[in-house]
Amino acid sequence: MTVETTNSSPVPGTIDAPPSAHGLIDRSKLRTLAQRSNRRGAARLAVHLGCVGTTGTLVWLTLPVWYLLVPAMVLHGITIVTMFAPMHECTHRTAFSSRRANDLVGWCAGVLSSYNATYYRYYHAWHHRYTQDPARDPELMYPRASDRLAYLKEISGLMFWYRRAIDYPALALGRAGALPFAPAEARHAIALSMSCQLLIYLAAAVAIAMGHNAALYFWFLPALLAMPLLRGYLITEHTGCSPDGNGLSNTRTTVALFPIRLLMWNMPYHAEHHLFPSIPFHQLPALHRQLRGRLAHVAPGYLATNREIFLSL
């Protein structure tokens, strides 16, 4: 599927609130909620990295015992693949008040979680702007699961890794010209960023081939084992929601347990985030309290929502 462009394309990489958000929150309240904080961003990042270190220690302690090692790697993998969340927050430049901190942390978090922050910023801006538009939403470049087998392939992570193997080398070679959300002036930066990221993966792979298995046990295998959990999280965000531009009904908020809210940087409040993408992660719970009664989709949990999606196919 191709993503169509229009003659009135906004400034690439910028994200405004959709029309459906207008009038929902008082402007003075929005200004208060939109205050970004280096301190809050650094604190959340420190907690997340602490979880990475703690679960990594569990992997190290269980290395000789496979029946303990696999659960430890799953736990560790969860902390790695959820580095997607700070990457996402940083591409909005809302994790920190410092633009430099957002860009640096976002890129590093993307490397860990197998996303490229430079590319994702432009991709994601169009996703916000054209949410659920099958011709222009980049998330719909690849069709959503239309049957149970396709759902299982998506949830397993197989399609994610396949697309990474195809798309990322092409982007590193500068082949972003067919993507309308990647402006000409950004394509060199995307190619350079992607090349640097792939070199890191290549260096890790070479180290493994030479018998140095740290990246295998503390990064690659944990990410592979935990990726289905991230896919199960992401598939709930828009699947089954209204196929239109109404931010009150085209995105799902999920009532999540504290560990999920912690590691996903409050992104379970996803409808709120889509309505007001300039609000930083630490203010999303307050925004949820303001908006909950207006939202069409507030789900009780990820297992229940995935079950509903699966049974609907």
Task: Name each model feature, range by range.
Residues 83-92, 120-132, 233-240, 264-279:
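Histidine-centered catalytic micro-motifs
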Residues 86-104, 138-142:
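Aspartate-rich (DDxxD/NDxxD/DxxxD) Mg2+/diphosphate-binding motifs
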Residues 1-77, 111-216, 281-313:
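Non-catalytic, topology-defining segments of multipass membrane proteins
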Residues 55, 91, 95-96, 245, ...:
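Active-site-flanking alpha-helical
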Residues 7, 179-237, 246, 251-252, ...:
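C-terminal membrane-associated helical module and adjoining short loops/tails
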Residues 77-87, 116-120, 164-167, 218-245, ...:
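Transmembrane alpha-helical segments that form the membrane-embedded catalytic/substrate-channel core
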Residues 29-34, 62-63, 95-99, 253-256:
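Helix-boundary and loop/linker segments of multi-pass membrane transporters
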